[in-house]
Amino acid sequence: MSLPSSRAARVPGPSGSLCALLALLLLLTPPGPLASAGPVSAVLTELRCTCLRVTLRVNPKTIGKLQVFPAGPQCSKVEVVASLKNGKQVCLDPEAPFLKKVIQKILDSGNKKN
């Protein structure tokens, strides 16, 4: 049994004017957070852990700056990144006894200045 072509079922869907209105609204909507997020590469690097492997020991005299990144949704572990005076960056084990001593020395020297 076949239906005549004039009586074929019509598939319900949005009308042409509704589609045009939605397209116009989409074009007029500012991108919002995407515009202020910065380069795509910066966004992508924040979605994973920074440290893939850690260095067990570094001479404390070669450390120029220490950065501590707390655990969060992007990485489940605390990460410590040391910027060395020669320009290299290395990841350190936050549980290493030598690192705890280095951090304590930094905190103590900061307290002496105050």
Curated annotation (Swiss-Prot):
Transmembrane segments annotated in the record for this chain: none
InterPro entries membership: Chemokine_b/g/d, Chemokine_CXC, Chemokine_CXC_CS, Chemokine_IL8-like_dom, CXC_Chemokine_domain, Interleukin_8-like_sf
Cellular component terms (Gene Ontology): extracellular region; extracellular space
GO process annotations (BP): antibacterial innate immune response; antimicrobial humoral immune response mediated by antimicrobial peptide; cell-cell signaling; cellular response to lipopolysaccharide; chemokine-mediated signaling pathway; chemotaxis; inflammatory response; leukocyte homeostasis
Cysteine disulfide links: 49-75, 51-91
Cleaved signal peptide residues: 1-37
Record keywords: Antibiotic, Antimicrobial, Chemotaxis, Cytokine, Disulfide bond, Heparin-binding, Secreted, Signal
Subcellular location: Secreted
Listed GO MF terms: chemokine activity; CXCR chemokine receptor binding; heparin binding
Principal location: secreted
Gene3D superfamilies referenced in this protein's UniProt entry, alphabetically: 2.40.50.40
Function: Chemotactic for neutrophil granulocytes. Signals through binding and activation of its receptors (CXCR1 and CXCR2). In addition to its chemotactic and angiogenic properties, it has strong antibacterial activity against Gram-positive and Gram-negative bacteria (90-fold-higher when compared to CXCL5 and CXCL7).
Family in the record: Belongs to the intercrine alpha (chemokine CxC) family.
Protein name: C-X-C motif chemokine 6
The species this protein was found in: Homo sapiens (Human)
Lineage: Eukaryota, Metazoa, Chordata, Craniata, Vertebrata
Name of the encoding gene: CXCL6
